[in-house]
Amino acid sequence: MGVLDGKALPIIEIAPLSGFYDYKNKYQAGSTIETCPADLSPEKTAEMQKYAETAFRALRLKNYARMDFMMGKAGDIYCLEANTLPGMTPTSLLPQEAAAVGISYEQLCEKLIEVSLRERDR
């Protein structure tokens, strides 16, 4: 999920229609179902968002990033990686997550510039 200015965005669930989420499933149109916000309980959503924000701070990240997680069948959450340069096309995951809370692509780009300039001026 994306973290923008230290605050987690909604979770996006990625479910490949077959196999694993590999290169083919990531880039071939129609190979995955992306659901945002993810169909999780409010408690599990809050837990995962807290982990994303905590990892963001622990890694001393700035401005924005996308934190990738997997959830096991029992609901265990595993942090896979911090992506410090996530895709930023209009259909990339971070813009989809922002759109889920009413932030347009244009507004997201403006927000990224705003937080970057604020960080630079510190």
Q: Residue locations for each model-derived region?
A:
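Generic C-terminus detector
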Residues: 93-95, 99-122
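Active-site anion/phosphate-binding pocket segments in diverse small-molecule metabolic enzymes
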Residues: 10, 51, 55-58, 62
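Peripheral (often C-terminal) accessory segments that flank ATP-dependent C-N-forming ligase machineries
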Residues: 43, 58-61, 71-73, 111-122
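A short, polar/charged loop-to-alpha-helix boundary motif
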Residues: 19-25, 89-97
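Electropositive phosphate-/nucleotide-binding environments in soluble metabolic enzymes
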Residues: 42-49, 88, 99-106
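Short amphipathic alpha-helical segments
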Residues: 49, 53, 109-110
